[in-house]
Amino acid sequence: MAEEEKTELPSAKKIQKAREEGNVPKSMEVVGVLGLLAGLISIFVFFIWWVDGFSEMYRHVLKDFSLDFSKESVQELFNQLAKDTFLLLLPILIILVVVAFLSNVLQFGWLFAPKVIEPKFSKINPINGVKNLFSLKKLLDGSLITLKVFLAFFLGFFIFSLFLGELNHAALLNLQGQLLWFKNKALWLISSLLFLFFVLAFIDLAIKRRQYTNSLKMTKQEVKDEYKQQEGNPEIKAKIRQMMLKNATNKMMQEIPKANVVVTNPTHYAVALKFDEEHPVPVVVAKGTDYLAIRIKGIAREHDIEIIENKTLARELYRDVKLNAAIPEELFEAVAIVFAQVAKLEQERQKQKIIKPL
């Protein structure tokens, strides 16, 4: 039997399971370009501080070398240089780590997936490694890198060619003017390349998300199986609902003998009302249409409960009043008329009982 094609979008459950396994749509191009931007901004912000710091280190080196040139002093000097260099570069390292973390959070949200670090044979299986090496995903990644290098080279060459026409003019400027000219052109080149890298990064992110969705697609049978797992077998649920409805109906039928009157349509609706000391307002103890209406009337006859025909009231009671709920105020008058009819019929019945022996 041929394998069924995966045409259905992944369910929320499958996406959540993939997230728990650390499988999320992620573009390293986005991480890289945001890191590059953060690095350039950091260089601009910390440049003067670094110049002062490295200048102080240089003066310190010259001073120590002039005083002592022993092995111990050289070792101590290099240790101090390494420490000072690390402290000078620490801010940008922290910034790059934070930006890398946030760039991942922006792509797929907060995620803690311990399963990622669990050992799996598939991760070290050389056959799987070879398959992944020649997969469509790797081909697209390689194509994007090639395109990125080509476009960056072309853009850089194009901008540099524009600068060539200004070199003669720049050569006539003083040193300060030349430095300013070089700074402006460098900013232009860097801004252009950053814009290109941002565009390519978001293209890569769109591709990664599409690949991710396609990799999680499901067959129609998988969708059905998952629905059964989450919601239960529809056939079993239908049987359970049927049994619950049957039990509720049987319980309702047991309340009919306690009713005072049944209001009918006369054929399609039947509503049983109860009115006693415990219920100062009449309560609907049973209601139904068609077959249920016939059953309600049948039980009412068996227990000598009056059946009053009132088409409008029967429909309103069935439609507007829930089971075991008191009737609303707007129906008080109509229901009172019905109970008056019941009382009148009861009086007539009592009179007939008294007259019969005579």
Curated annotation (Swiss-Prot):
S-S bonds: none
Pfam families the UniProt entry points to: Bac_export_2
GO biological-process terms attached to the record: bacterial-type flagellum assembly; protein secretion
Location, primary (coarse class): membrane
Keyword Glycosyltransferase: no
Family annotation (SUPFAM superfamilies): EscU C-terminal domain-like (SSF160544)
Keyword Transmembrane helix: yes
Record GO cellular component, one term: plasma membrane
Transmembrane region(s): 31-51, 86-106, 144-164, 187-207, 323-343
Membrane topology summary: Multi-pass membrane protein
Coiled-coil intervals: none
Subcellular location: Cell inner membrane
Keywords: Bacterial flagellum biogenesis, Bacterial flagellum protein export, Cell inner membrane, Cell membrane, Membrane, Protein transport, Transmembrane, Transmembrane helix, Transport
InterPro entries in the record: FlhB, T3SS_substrate_exporter, T3SS_substrate_exporter_C
Family the entry assigns: Belongs to the type III secretion exporter family.
Job description of the protein: Required for formation of the rod structure in the basal body of the flagellar apparatus. Together with FliI and FliH, may constitute the export apparatus of flagellin.
Protein name in UniProt: Flagellar biosynthetic protein FlhB
Organism: Helicobacter pylori (strain ATCC 700392 / 26695) (Campylobacter pylori)
Organismal lineage: Bacteria, Pseudomonadati, Campylobacterota, Epsilonproteobacteria, Campylobacterales
Gene: flhB
